[in-house]
Design a protein with these regions (language model features):
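Short, acidic/small-residue loops that bind anionic groups at enzyme active sites
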Residues: 10-14, 78-103
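General beta-strand structural signal in soluble alpha/beta enzymes
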Residues: 14, 31, 63-65, 99-104, ...
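A glycine/threonine-rich phosphate-anchoring loop and its flanking beta-alpha core
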Residues: 93, 99-166, 176
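C-terminal non-catalytic interaction/assembly regions of soluble proteins
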Residues: 1, 241-265
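A glycine- and small-aliphatic-rich helix-loop capping segment at beta-alpha/alpha-beta transitions
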Residues: 2-8, 26-28, 53, 76-87, ...
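Accessory alpha-helical/coil subdomains and C-terminal extensions
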Residues: 124-127, 149-241, 245-248
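Glycine-rich oxoanion-binding loops at beta->alpha junctions
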Residues: 13-57, 101, 105-106
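Short beta-strand segments
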Residues: 13-16, 62-67, 93, 128-134, ...
Length: 265
């Protein structure tokens, strides 16, 4: 807002976690739930879609994306209730699914994920500025890729649920099966015309942050060891491994151990 010309039109909507909102003048801020979606996030997602539909060829859609957007903007597709979306999300988390597996399912159950925001706003110029929290920095995986092509399918979502032995709620199963059979449209894929005027740009990632931490410790005379920027798996298992490493190394020297990635809680 501070850097936008005062006489230029500006409107917008930001959705963030509870207790993370900041005062604004021209852009509305809504707080919602993470990691399980709630009604405030659903309502905000529907409003965001409505705002995007009103954009024309002379408009610019600026999308600021960071991790957590999948839950904060979780408006279920028609035929799936918010309760059912919460149930399947909770089941995926409890099953130890990777963030890739979770996103594969959620992209096909919500209205903005998997490139659907770009599809809705395709009349306008679009620029998505992305802070990555995922291994590999794929725009399609960050916040479930609202502005990026989706390489996965409803068949993939069903396969993930079956592999994890999750029995989805009826609405979820019916939607995914209808989509897999071609009776409902899937998410927009690479090459879809809706992405012709949309640019996805990763402006910050975990590796850059980790290297900044390494430099900070070294500048203060503390040796730093970057273990990995691709840590994944169950959070408890990863924590035990890190604790064991700290216990073994701390006996001999002062050392900062640094790692990044995305674990499943």
């Amino acid at each position: 807002e501070a850097h936008w010309p005062a006489d230029a039109p500006l409107s917008g909507l930001v959705v963030t976690r509870y207790l993370h909102g900041l005062p604004t003048r021209r852009i509305e801020v809504v707080e919602a739930s993470h990691p399980l979606p709630d009604g405030r996030g659903e309502a905000a997602a529907l409003r965001m879609l409505d705002m995007s539909r009103q954009l024309g060829p002379d408009d610019l859609l600026l999308v600021l994306i960071s991790g957590g957007g999948s839950s904060l903007l979780a408006a279920p597709v028609e035929g799936v209730t918010l309760k059912e979306l919460r149930q399947v999300t909770k089941a995926l988390l409890h099953a130890g699914a990777s963030i890739h597996d979770i996103n594969t399912v959620r992209k096909h159950l919500t209205r903005l994920s998997g490139g659907q925001l770009a599809q809705t706003a395709q009349a306008a110029h679009g620029l998505a500025l992305i802070i990555s929290d995922v291994v590999g920095d794929d725009p399609g995986s960050i916040a479930s890729g609202p502005c990026a092509p989706d390489a996965s399918s409803c068949v993939d979502a069903l396969d993930q649920l079956q592999r994890l032995r999750i029995t989805p709620p009826a609405g979820v199963r019916h939607h995914l099966e209808a989509c897999a059979a071609g009776r409902l449209p899937d998410t927009p894929k690479p090459g879809n015309a809706c992405f012709a005027r949309m640019e996805n740009r990763v402006i910050a990632c975990a590796h850059g942050s980790l290297m900044a931490a390494v430099r900070y410790f070294e500048q203060h005379g503390i040796p730093a060891l970057l273990l990995s920027d691709k840590v994944g798996g169950d959070a408890q298992s990863v924590a035990r491994q890190h604790a064991a490493l700290v216990h073994a190394l701390a006996r001999r020297q002062t050392l900062a151990l640094i790692s990044g990635g995305e674990t499943t809680v």
